[in-house]
Amino acid sequence: MIIVGVLFFLLVYTWIIFPGVMLFAFRRDHPGRADLPCNEDTLPLTIVIFVHNEEGVLENSLSALTTCPAHLWNAEFIIILDASTDGSHAVVERFQALDKRFTLIQCDDRLGKPGQWHKHQDMLRARKGYLLSLDADVIIQSEGWRILHRLVQQNPEAIIAGRSRSQSNSTEVYFESESMYLSLETRLKLAEGDVFRRAMGVFGACYILPCKNLPVIPPNLTVDDFFIAYAQLKAGKPSIVSREIVAHEHVSGKLAVEFRRKRRITCGNWQNLLKLPKLPGRGSFQTLWLLWSHKILRWLTPILGIALIVSGCFLDTYLQPYGYFWSLTCIGFIILCLGAHYLGERLFHRSPKLLQGFSYFIIMNMAVLCGTFDFVLGRRHGIWKPTERMHNE
């Protein structure tokens, strides 16, 4: 009975209590964190974009880079082509001919973004000033450069990320559910950065940090953004998500695509967890508490949920048959909800939003469970194809 109570508490804690406490704290004012006065000094900036077959979005992104004001940023744009087979190379060369700030690095071997980080980390770490990592489809608006300049002056040692906002051309019903989850994640990371200056992970589409603070990135990494952000925290550097900088993240809304993405990310996060103790520095109590509350318990949710459901079969005999009834009721309820949602979509092309959200939650936790099994069994995921969910599907 005690074990059942502990399992139930952990699930309620990570999905209800912890977010509730953090969002409540986020609503409070923090007068001791007033904005510091800033100057207009020119700062060195290296912008790195890893590109694999992004011809459709690359021209707009590179055009936005040319608006970077020279009086604020002494900028250089490094575009690393990860074995692109489309016209991305020609797009970058065209910009390179018109603007000397562009540098093209072409790699024939397909390594993926983490692999390219590992290959070029020494060169990037040795540069002066700040390093801004952007996804190939992210567009920095003209006013964003001044905001970025102010933020790095106020937080010179921090890793600062833009907040994520999902968008998609897809009409799939699951886009809304994924957007709601991403919105909750964004608000939690905003709160963690605002209250503790320790946002658990950054959104990989847009973040900046001092070049010298780029950690040593190991080979065969699957998920790079969480590793880089946590390395900053362990080294005692702040991690912040800015409300003023918005990075639009493309999600497909297609169930199969999001399932594979969640599965791959979960496997990569468990791999990262084994590498974190080897990072230099010592994590504070607040950092470890946030890591456990926001990340690890989320990754353990499907295992905790299954254990809670089947625990009814192992209760003391004096509590039976209520324990069996509990287990069968939970299993039946999940099957009923998934079945009702499936039939609603097939027959009527719609289902209630609450039912849709619950079904999406269950299916995504199944993806997390598969990713956990992949990690335990030592399975390697293939290199992710970003174009699969960045273009119109």
Identify what each model region corresponds to.
Residues 1-39:
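N-terminal membrane-anchoring/stem segments of glycan-assembly enzymes
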Residues 28-29, 39, 298-380:
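Membrane-embedded multi-pass helical conduit in multi-pass membrane proteins
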Residues 57-60, 86-95, 117, 143:
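Acidic helix N-cap motif at the loop->helix transition within catalytic regions
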Residues 63-74:
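Short, acidic, metal-binding catalytic loop of nucleotide-sugar glycosyltransferases
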Residues 81-90, 109-111, 138-139:
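A conserved acidic beta->alpha catalytic loop
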Residues 106, 113-117, 128, 142-221, ...:
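Long helical/loop segments within the catalytic core of UDP-sugar-dependent glycosyltransferases
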Residues 131:
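Short aromatic/hydrophobic "clamp" motif used to bind/position activated sugar donors
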Residues 152, 156-184, 220-221, 228-294, ...:
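Catalytic donor/gating beta->alpha subdomain of glycosyltransferases that bind UDP-sugars
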